[in-house]
Amino acid sequence: MINLWMFLALCIVCVSGYIGQVLNVVSAVSSFFGMVILAALIYYFTMWLTGGNELVTGIFMFLAPACGLMIRFMVGYGRR
């Protein structure tokens, strides 16, 4: 499970860095915190839903960077 956590943290940092290059630093910081909160919510919800199955929970947590990237660009392109 620690490997999933490390890879998830790397994904969130990389997505935030990409958003920072494309939009600006404020967007990168806000998307970082949004993805961390989303990953925590997904973790607790899927742990409750699957009865503690960590593999399924770890796989579902990778929705956080993908959703964070999509949401950030939808909001970001609306401002330009």
From Swiss-Prot:
Gene name for this UniProt entry: yfdY
Transmembrane segments: 2-22, 32-52, 55-75
Pfam families listed in its UniProt record: DUF2545 (PF10810)
Protein name: Uncharacterized protein YfdY
Cellular component GO terms, alphabetical: plasma membrane
Membrane topology recorded in Swiss-Prot or TrEMBL: Multi-pass membrane protein
Statement: the UniProt record of this protein carries the keyword Mitochondrion: no
Annotated localization: Cell membrane
Organism, scientific name: Escherichia coli (strain K12)
Lineage: Bacteria, Pseudomonadati, Pseudomonadota, Gammaproteobacteria, Enterobacterales
Highest taxon of the lineage: Bacteria
Keywords: Cell membrane, Membrane, Transmembrane, Transmembrane helix
